[in-house]
Amino acid sequence: MSTQIEDQDWKSKLNIPKKDTRPQTEDVLSTKGNTFEDFYLKRELLMGIFEAGFEKPSPIQEESIPVALAGRDILARAKNGTGKTAAFVIPTLEKVKSKHNKIQALIMVPTRELALQTSQVVRTLGKHCGISCMVTTGGTNLRDDILRLNETVHILVGTPGRVLDLASRKVADLSECNLFIMDEADKMLSRDFKSIIEQILVFLPKNHQSLLFSATFPLSVKEFMVNHLHKPYEINLMDELTLKGITQYYAFVEEKQKLHCLNTLFSKLQINQAIIFCNSTNRVELLAKKITDLGYSCYYSHARMKQQERNRVFHEFRQGKVRTLVCSDLLTRGIDIQAVNVVINFDFPKTAETYLHRIGRSGRFGHLGLAINLINWNDRFNLYKIEQELGTEIQAIPATIDKSLYVANDNSAVPVPFPIEQSHVQPSMQQQHMPLPPQQPIPNQQFGGMPQQYSPQQQQYQQYPPQGMAMPPQGIQMQQQPQF
């Protein structure tokens, strides 16, 4: 009798975080009403799911988890920010046997930051399961990875080049890896990675199960499906490509006035955290310097930085130590930072696919977000083309933007991100003190009817973080570029 009572009360003993009370869209709410318990998952996994703050499965999780548990190959297409990572991590943790000390699942992702994030989702959801997860990416010490693989690893998360290197050296034994997963499958099967993926598959058992997840499925994915998947179960939840919770605006502005416009946006928008995208690494560094010159705290990240510095920037931005991150398309793939409510395309992207992934960094998991695009005369054809391809309307920016479109009523409801394993992160950046700029207008430039001046709200914003400003990582030499 006491055992039955204990079985009924196990949920009440969990350390469940504060409920996320922010409004959500039907991107994550239009489900069939199933719960995680309906999937008959093991108790230890359910404990990790609920302690991570998950309440009910999203549509992609509801569709894919039971099919994956049944052992079928899956080709799943769903919007960015709707819970795809948990959709494959949960069945992976359920299928992996903790007492079998072999690599049983391989999760492939295109970027190092996404590998770190995915591994932490595995560790967070599986913290009661006794399952070991290792992340391996290029740009890190190969010897360290070899030493770690001498210990028990059940789930390997990595980028293609490093995984192939370890498998070719016979350091990573994939002979009993019966579960192969590709997140951002469209990127994984692009020309950059396809040949490497084909080589990795040679090391896996022939009858392995494959799970492919992405927001877009080009022809390369269909070719892979024909050649390597066995009667895959296809899931398509893309009635439209863009997230319903993201409001999109554009503003025509001359190149030399973009910085003024950005400064106005900083002063007028209620930014929780923002990501600003540029089309080149040189422009990323230059814009980050200009933003800090204006008195705002700012980090930057791009592919030419050392991996430890990229990890540090990613970790501290996720932890909310700075509000603004300037980056290239390095962080367009799968990166989930719940506190980001504004995305600004300082440089307008060239393709609809890039645009879709960029704006998907806001409005995560059905919440509200704002995407603002600074458009010059040369971008007007791209703007029209992207609207047509995505079937969406990007509106002209109004004089004032309704805060209810992108700001949660209760900012404390934003969940704390999964922690990044400290072994992958360098010590915190040394903050530097800088006086606030004077409260005076910036030269006569107006944008969308909004005057260029430092408001009390902007001064409060400039004081974040309280102890000063965060410069771009130390040791990175700024590139010489023309002024904006």
Swiss-Prot record:
A single GO cellular-component term on record: cytoplasmic side of membrane
Alphabetical GO biological process terms: cellular response to glucose starvation; cellular response to nitrogen starvation; deadenylation-dependent decapping of nuclear-transcribed mRNA; invasive filamentous growth; mRNA processing; mRNA transport; negative regulation of translational elongation; P-body assembly
UniProt KW Membrane keyword: no
Record domain Helicase ATP-binding: where: 65-235
Stretches for region Disordered: 1-27, 430-484
Main location: cytoplasm
Domain Helicase C-terminal, chain residue ranges per copy: 245-405
Catalytic reactions on record: ATP + H2O = ADP + phosphate + H(+)
Motif DEAD box in this chain: 183-186
InterPro entries, sorted: DEAD/DEAH_box_helicase_dom, Helicase_ATP-bd, Helicase_C-like, P-loop_NTPase, RNA-helicase_DEAD-box_CS, RNA_helicase_DEAD_Q_motif
Biased composition (Low complexity): 442-484
Domain notes: The Q motif is unique to and characteristic of the DEAD box family of RNA helicases and controls ATP binding and hydrolysis.
Purpose: ATP-dependent RNA helicase involved in mRNA turnover, and more specifically in mRNA decapping by activating the decapping enzyme DCP1. Is involved in G1/S DNA-damage checkpoint recovery, probably through the regulation of the translational status of a subset of mRNAs. May also have a role in translation and mRNA nuclear export.
Protein name: ATP-dependent RNA helicase DHH1
Lineage, highest ranks first: Eukaryota, Fungi, Dikarya, Ascomycota, Saccharomycotina
